[in-house]
Amino acid sequence: MRKDKMENFEILPTEENLIKTLEADLLGRNQQLSYFYNLLLAQKGASTIAVDGKWGSGKTFFIKQSTMVINAKNPVSIIEKEKREKILSKLFLTESDNYDDCNLAIYYDAWENDNDTDPIVSLVYEIAKQLGMTYTFDPDTDFFKLGGAVLDVFSGKNLKGIIENLKSDNPLSKFKEQKALEEKLKDFFSEALNERGNRLVVFIDELDRCKPSFTVRLLEQIKHYMHDERITYVLSINTEELQHTIKNYYGCGGDERRDRQARLL
């Protein structure tokens, strides 16, 4: 008796598949990718852009291709010349000979990291790893050490922590640590962009699949500590699911939920 097997037509976002679908425009998205690249290139100052779509709509594929296109355009990226030409030729782009005119792109899978206590640590680590950085932090003001103390007080719903801090003998100590953390992150981003590019584009994927506490914590930490004029954040999200996440975390709905979402994004 003949048994038919159901074929799996899912295209995984491997590097090979990302390039193949670009070459033949199999997904019919090349024009959108080109428009999106130019949109990102036109960003001035700190900005956040949301790529909104339901689960299974191809958001991950789209932002991984966008990451690849941005880095292919940058002459200091590690993409091989043959691959670079394949990527850019299909989008009518040419390789730049000046990194000052280019962006750098980083892909961060939030869902893979949602067991981390402090999202900011895994995000900075991912940036350093993907850029091949050997950045050395001052052990006296290492933000990995500062992060635990400062972020516990200034993130999430930890109002009690803020009140206790204000009652302490030195109520400004945490605020000073906060400023030290901000300065270390600015130094880090300056090092990341030095002789590599003009702006950094950080793609954050799978945010709406994370634990509510991680999602809110990550967005708050980016807002408070990683807000930089040289960075564009691209959030791959399902807006409806993100609204549920915010509602579950804060216990609010309606206008208050939308207001909190607007502030976070």
Outline where the language-model segments fall:
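P-loop NTPase nucleotide-binding core
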Residues: 57-194
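Catalytic acidic motif of RecA-like/P-loop NTPases
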Residues: 52, 56, 205-216, 223
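Short hydrophobic/aromatic beta-strand immediately N-terminal to the Walker A/P-loop
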Residues: 48-52, 107, 203
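Walker A/P-loop-proximal flanking segment of P-loop NTPase domains
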Residues: 1-95, 121
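The catalytic "switch" region of P-loop NTPases
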Residues: 2-24, 29-33, 69, 196-200, ...
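Conserved strand-to-helix beginnings and helix N-cap segments that scaffold or border functional pockets
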Residues: 117-121, 212-219
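Catalytic P-loop NTPase motifs of RecA-like helicase/translocase cores
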Residues: 114, 192, 207-211, 242-243
